[in-house]
Regions:
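FKBP-type peptidyl-prolyl cis-trans isomerase
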Residues: 2, 33-48, 284
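Extracytoplasmic
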Residues: 6, 12-19, 45-307
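Short acidic, Pro/Gly- and aromatic-enriched capping/linker segments at domain boundaries
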Residues: 13-33
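Well-ordered beta-strand scaffold positions
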Residues: 21-24, 38, 178
């Protein structure tokens, strides 16, 4: 990754550290810049040994929803501004995209064009989402999206980040190893995205409380997990009217724990089906997906970080 557009894509002095695995550093002083990219030599031989699945890959994995769909990135939609979108579609005033039913390779719909997918660019409304943009769908939706494979067989949690709004809907989530919905199993009870926690606290449904209270939120973090929820990640600031607020402190930014159990390497599909098909204008919103090994959320000595 790079912090400067047009740079070498390697920031000097930044190196990820994993306990028990030192890694192989990049020799940034010897990087070469041919016509079509960059070449970064390594200072040692990089091998895929037992440390990779047992140490390096036993971390929380977070995927922005649009990164799960190749076409969003290869066609320049992900992260686009309103001005860039106008250039793409060659039509002034456009700040959102509506996609054809079979546009995405890793997304399957089960009711044809009744499920409407939309992408709202990051500077259109300043949404309180990760990176400010919003991928959502409307109508009596019923679709499945392919998730990344886990790096190693084991016990994991799957969570979804979303922004609660009264305009949202209510849905049932299913999980399976293929897009064949007859083989999928329901995950927990339906999720009601319409429920917005009160800024003063929401003990009954989500367990959310202002993050500065009760030991800086540590006590209510556990209360939320008992309800099947988590706060938004401390990793990013929200946009829009609440700009400047950390997601963790924003009452609408939530994570729902969808599944906890054994997962094997291989294909993984998640289905989202409305339980309110008559509410055709209600929205489904997916901000990001987290796949988390049990060594992170159930470590015998350490609590999972709030980022």
């Amino acid at each position: 990754l790079t912090s400067t557009a047009g740079s070498t894509s390697v920031d000097d002095g930044i190196q990820a550290e994993v306990e028990g695995a030192t890694g192989v550093p990049v020799d940034t002083k010897k990087s070469a810049n041919p016509l079509n990219g960059w070449i970064h030599p390594l200072k040692d031989i990089l091998t895929y040994n037992s440390l990779v699945p047992n140490k390096v890959l036993k971390e929380r994995m977070r995927f922005d929803d649009t990164s799960l769909l190749d076409e969003m990135m290869t066609n320049g939609f992900r992260g686009a501004t309103k001005a860039e979108l106008v250039t793409l579609v060659k039509k002034s005033g456009k700040s959102r995209v509506i996609f054809p039913t079979k546009y995405f390779r890793n997304l399957v719909t089960y009711n044809d064009n009744q499920t409407v997918f939309k992408y709202l660019v990051k500077d259109e409304g300043g949404y309180a989402n990760y990176q400010g943009d919003e991928f959502l769908c409307e109508g009596p939706y019923d679709f499945a999206i392919k998730l990344p494979s886990v790096p190693k067989d084991g016990t994991y949690e799957i969570r979804m980040g979303y922004t609660a709004e009264t305009a949202r809907g209510m849905l049932q989530v299913y999980l399976g190893t293929s897009s064949d919905r007859s083989t999928m199993q329901a995950c927990d009870i339906p999720l009601d995205m319409r429920h917005v926690p009160s800024k003063s606290g929401d003990a009954a449904v989500t367990g959310w409380q202002p993050s500065g209270e009760l030991d800086n939120g540590v006590a209510t973090d556990q209360a939320m997990r008992n309800h099947g929820y988590m706060r938004g990640a401390y990793y990013y600031y929200v946009e829009g009217p609440n700009k400047g607020n950390i997601s963790r402190a924003h009452h609408k930014n939530l994570r729902r724990i969808l599944y906890r159990g054994h997962l094997n390497q291989g294909d993984l599909w998640m289905r989202f089906k409305t339980v309110l098909p008559e509410a055709t204008s209600s929205q489904f919103h997916l901000d990001y997906i987290e796949i988390v090994p049990s060594e992170v959320y159930n470590h015998p000595e350490y609590s999972e970080d709030i980022f």
